Amino acid sequence: MADQNERAFQKQFGVNLNRKVKPGITKKKLLRRSRDVGLGFKTPREAIDGTYIDKKCPWTGDVRIRGRILTGVVRKAKMQRTIVIRRDYLHFVRKYSRFEKRHRNMSVHCSPVFRDVEHGDIVTIGECRPLSKTVRFNVLKVSKGQGAKKSFKKY
């Protein structure tokens, strides 16, 4: 069962907690629902076997991934289930026929599947419906960062 540390009872949408168990089927398997987000991303083991409840998770919640798939570097991971990533890009200045470096910070929902997301990790994110005022993307994959290199990285 999920950790009940919120005021409201935490329960996964679409799962009946009072369902009768037939012989040969474990009750734990009936109390969890997970799905495949598609687009070549595998469902993490933690999403299938875990006990967390997150309605904004792309594997166990009611959020669909559609639209853009982007990458970025984690800048901050201080919020609960939300991280800030930095996306670097080059902007062309016609007057000087040169490129200039620019960046954009984005708030991204990070499911409890990815427990050990740290500053400097490279994340792949997918677009979904607006989850809050500033969050419109969900983390789909985490790769460990290279360490201390130059801050600007073009993807």
From Swiss-Prot:
GO terms for biological process: cytoplasmic translation. Pfam families: Ribosomal_S17 (PF00366), Ribosomal_S17_N (PF16205). GO terms for molecular function: rRNA binding; structural constituent of ribosome. The keyword Nucleotide-binding does not apply. One of its GO terms (cellular component) is cytosolic small ribosomal subunit. It comes from the Eukaryota. Keywords: Acetylation, Ribonucleoprotein, Ribosomal protein, RNA-binding, rRNA-binding. SUPFAM superfamilies: Nucleic acid-binding proteins. The keyword Acetylation applies. Disulfide bonds: none annotated. The modification N-acetylalanine is found at A2. Belongs to the universal ribosomal protein uS17 family. This is Small ribosomal subunit protein uS17. It comes from Drosophila melanogaster.
